[in-house]
A protein has these predicted regions:
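Membrane-embedded transmembrane helical bundles of large multi-pass transporters/channels
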Residues: 1-35, 134-375, 493-685
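Surface-exposed, low-hydrophobicity interaction/linker segments
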Residues: 35-37, 103-104
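Ser/Thr/Pro/Gly-rich low-complexity linker/stalk segments immediately outside membranes or between
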Residues: 36-41, 376-378
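Structured non-transmembrane domains adjacent to transmembrane bundles in polytopic membrane proteins
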Residues: 45-67, 71-157, 374, 380-542, ...
Length: 685
């Protein structure tokens, strides 16, 4: 490695030029990376609902209704005018209202009340709209402009459009505040006014490279777009700081050596620690790649790539930048702003055993509670009632109740069997209406007598389409039970020869997919990190202690919603399990490394105090940065999935930090005879 680092130092101007060019190209590439805000797009291709949607899109021109629009204080003629105007909007492929089910020229009082009130109630008209995915942003905005602020719209298309528009501005706000905080914390923890700017420059270069190289994926998820950069900032913060501090140490130890020689020495001495730290983080992130739910691989690959690029930046760009600016660092040198943590170290040495006991007591209940949460699986609850979308959804449900749309595809022909299926589906209490050939044209009416535009919506491409309106949420026990019942009913008449699609159906498949991912992802993350530690430490007990400490922090973090009676987004639950392990196990590794170093010259208790004093600044810098980034995400994101992921990140960072600085010392103290190599050691006081 020394030869490589010597070459980097000698060609530092070329390195700076290459990174400057790469940063410019990355900025240009970032704008071309597409972001997907539809959570259902990340279902595995082989999931039943995904297959059903693909078959339906191949056979029919119209998709599944994905928006409900409520207009207040309108008459029937005015509602019909609104229907025509909505249908004329570019991107709207279909609009359904009362006139599609009943003859609205007949007085409504003389018609079926349930049918009428599904579309028109208390002077409010409810339209069921199908919006094309490619044009949903423009179409949703146009519908909003048409109906005005006093009316309401909700549905999957609206949720996706709102997420798209809000996340961009919110991420920019989070990033700006995070950078200011990181600058503040770096000013406190470094001894040069120039050093924080150098560290931020290096981090900025790595983040730009990661964002630009996301172009290789073509499209990234909204989770990756929102969390990727700020997570990279938080987990990579200490790499550059560590290198610069090593450089300062080498210059102080060998005052006669040139800055170039000191930098090569600093790189050689810091490579092992930085690489081991980065490797465990990468492994934790890569565990997400095994998820069938494709947001996992999407986020895992992007984060792992980000850490790798941060490491590349630290070992190439930062040496060149530091050598270009070290004179500026010398001129702006100042006394440390933070006090010594010696007293804190001695305090921890006194309380470490009780804290270790407390953690042992918490292990089992926190594990059980973390696995007993109630979950949201889909996108239905991503926006709370404090948002415009949440308020609109509540208003529509208050007037017209809940609603979802399922689409059943069965082979064309055999209208007698279709009629039997329709009759059976009508017996399901939650099914409030069915639009199909046998329901609207009649099983005895030949196809050639049905108008072409109507026929094309119901029969096409060898399939007959039955559109079910159901009184159900898009997720929850009731919704999932309904999906199972509809599937079982259709299975009776078309055994393994049908397709079922819909928002609730996709959410059911999401539940199936991501719950199956849980054990696999967690075991791989834990096993891989444990294996890396086993290879690094060359002993069994210490890796067990380190991994168990961080896993307990994860259990405590995920147990908090259980005790507060809150629902958890299962996607956030899965992601944080791997991310918290990968991002915070470094704290435990650093602590154990320094403890082993101090044990060469100090007794057990003194080594604990010295270790706490030595590492508190370092782990607090990274831990507090990650916590602030997480809490900012939780406070600013209107998307409740991203907000919850942020809060998990913030709480998890602080819990991991607290355990490493309070309970882990007690475990190391107790396990000392088994983890410290037998040497002639000082006698304990």
């Amino acid at each position: 490695m020394k030869r490589f680092y010597t070459a980097i130092v000698r060609r530092r101007r070329l390195v700076l030029a290459v990174f400057a060019l790469a940063a410019v190209l990355s900025m240009a590439a970032t704008s071309r990376v597409q972001v997907d805000y539809d959570i259902n797009d990340y279902l595995p291709p082989e999931s039943p609902s995904t297959t059903a949607i693909e078959v339906m899109n191949g056979a029919f021109t119209g998709g599944i209704p994905n928006m409900r629009v409520m207009v207040r204080d309108v008459t029937v003629p005015q509602a019909l005018e609104y229907k025509e105007k909505i249908a004329a909007i570019d991107g709207v492929s279909a609009v359904a209202w009362l006139d599609d089910s009943l003859d609205v020229t007949v007085p409504l009082q003389m018609q079926d009340t349930a049918t009428v009130e599904s579309y028109y109630k208390d002077g409010c008209a409810l339209f069921t709209v199908t919006v094309e995915d490619e044009k949903r942003l423009e179409a949703v905005a146009a519908v909003r402009d048409l109906i005005g602020e006093g009316n309401a719209l909700e549905g999957a298309a609206v949720s996706t459009a709102v997420a798209t528009n809000s996340t961009v501005t919110e991420v920019a706000k989070i990033a700006a505040i995070a950078v200011v905080y990181v600058l503040f914390i770096l000013i406190l923890t470094t001894d040069s006014w120039a050093e924080p700017l150098l560290v931020l420059t290096g981090l900025g270069a790595a983040i730009l490279l990661n964002n630009g190289t996301n172009l290789i994926f073509g499209t990234i998820s909204f989770v990756t777009n929102a969390a990727g950069s700020i997570l990279q900032l938080a987990v990579s913060l200490d790499y550059s700081v560590f290198l610069i501090h090593r450089f300062a140490e080498c210059r102080a130890e060998t005052p006669g050596a040139s800055p170039e020689e000191c930098m090569v020495d600093a790189l050689c001495r810091s490579t092992g620690s930085i690489l081991s730290s980065g490797l465990t983080t990468v492994i934790g992130f890569l565990a997400l790649v095994l998820m069938q739910f494709q947001i996992g691989p999407d986020l895992g690959l992007a984060l792992a790539k980000g850490v790798v690029l941060s490491l590349v930046t630290v070992f190439t760009f930062m040496p060149a930048l530091t050598l270009a600016c070290y004179k500026w660092m010398d001129k702006t040198h100042h006394r440390p702003l933070l006090p010594s943590f010696d007293k804190f170290g001695r305090f921890v040495a006194r309380i470490m055993l009780p804290m270790a006991l407390v953690l042992v007591i918490l292990m089992v209940p926190s594990y059980l509670a973390s696995n007993s949460n109630q979950y949201y699986y889909g996108a239905a609850h991503m926006f709370g009632e404090n948002t415009r979308l949440g308020a609109d959804t509540a208003a529509i449900e208050e007037t017209f109740g809940r609603s979802d749309t399922y689409v059943v595809l069965v082979p064309e022909g055999d209208t007698a069997t279709q009629q039997k299926l329709s009759d059976a589906l009508h017996t399901i209490p939650e099914v409030t209406g069915i639009l199909s050939y046998v329901d609207n044209a009649g099983a005895s009416i030949p196809l050639e007598f049905v108008p072409g535009d109507t026929l094309g919506l119901l029969v096409s491409g060898g399939y007959t389409r039955m559109v079910l309106t159901v009184d159900a949420d898009t997720e929850g026990d009731g919704a999932f039970a309904l999906v199972e019942r509809v599937r079982a009913t259709v299975q009776q008449y078309y055994p393994d020869n049908y397709y079922l699609a819909g928002q609730g159906v996709s959410t059911y498949d999401l539940m199936d997919t991501i719950t199956a991912d849980m054990v696999k992802v967690n075991l791989l993350a834990i096993g891989a990190v444990f294996l890396i530690l086993l290879l690094m430490k060359r002993q069994l007990l210490l890796p067990i202690i380190l991994v168990l400490s961080i896993e307990t922090a994860i259990w405590i973090n995920l147990a908090i919603p259980y005790f507060r009676g809150q629902y958890v987004f299962y996607i956030a639950y899965l992601i944080i399990s791997s991310v918290q392990l990968g991002a915070t196990v470094d704290y435990a590794i650093l602590f154990s490394d320094r403890y082993q170093e101090f044990r060469e010259t100090l007794g057990r208790k003194e080594a604990v105090a010295a270790t706490v004093s030595a590492v508190t600044t370092s782990v607090s810098t990274t831990g507090s940065a990650m916590a602030v980034v997480g809490f900012l995400m939780g406070a600013i994101s209107t998307n409740q999935l991203l907000g919850q992921l942020g809060n998990f990140l913030g709480v998890g960072s602080l819990v991991s930090l607290a355990i490493v600085l309070s309970a882990l010392p007690g475990f190391l103290y107790l396990a000392d005879p088994l983890i410290i190599k037998k040497k002639k050691q000082p006698k304990e006081a």
